[in-house]
Amino acid sequence: CSSDLNPKIESVREGVKLCKENSIDMVLAIGGGSVIDCAKVVAAGACYDGDPWDLVITPRWIKKALPIYSVLTLSATGSEMDKFAVISDMSKNEKWGTASDHMKPKMSILDPEYTYSVSKKQTAAGTADIISHICENYFTNVKNADVQARFAEGLLKNCFKYGPVALEEPDNYDARANLMWTASMAINGMIQYGAEVAWCVHPMEHELSAFYDITHGEGLAILTPHWMEFALNDDTAYKFADYARNVWDVVNDDDMAAAKEGIACTREYFKKMGLPQT
């Protein structure tokens, strides 16, 4: 299954047509999240009589799907280990997420060496996507879910440590391996148990890329620090302070001041990774 920068419904329709005309009995996705997302909806669309766009905007209509297998070549979306897919219809400037247990890959091959050739741009954008997935699950109003919080903080520290290494040493196995496994852990459900997850930043980025077809991770890197500043207030300062102290090793007893330092560290990190700021 081949796909675009942001997987398009036209690619899905083409894939569904091929499956139906050739009695295909499984779908193999070789690539990153865009390819895997496309493959998931192709697999579901092959078992549906209508337009596959119906399954994007109405996930409950997904009743079955062809078996899906993936070979991951880009660490970012975590699509290799979850039930989600995001598809765009540029003719309508719409980008929607869909989900179904039927679309979970039956098997995914994760070999870090397959990511050695990923460009600096995509490595940086992919790392930003991983970070955003973790933050979406981490910044919630649920208190005392310490196992999930510490797990999320560990995953974030992994991104902040190994992202720059992968940029400078693209064939560094440890960096690529840690980013690859972190991407899968970030969105497979492990860190959201017991949390009330709102998913604030991703929907905003979907609107941006629906109109401008920008790289998803770059859009997230632009939006994330701004969202953090918007969400920071007296009621949320404690959580952003935890983030600053436990992830960025900020030493400041004042929650609000510590929180602002953590946000500044995040913005500076994205800048050093070569990601756009506006």
Give the positions of each predicted feature.
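Short, small-residue-biased leader/transition segments that mark boundaries at the very start
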Residues: 1-2
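Structural motif
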Residues: 5-14
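Short Gly/Thr/Asp-enriched flexible loops that form oxyanion-binding sites at enzyme active sites
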Residues: 13-16, 35-49, 81-82
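Glycine/serine-rich anion-binding loops at beta->alpha junctions
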Residues: 24-40, 73-79, 211-214
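Short glycine-rich or small-residue beta-strand-to-loop segments that form or flank ligand, phosphate
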Residues: 27-30, 69, 186-187
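A glycine/threonine-rich phosphate-anchoring loop and its flanking beta-alpha core
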Residues: 47-150, 238, 242
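Active-site segments that bind and position negatively charged phosphate/pyrophosphate groups
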Residues: 137, 141-265
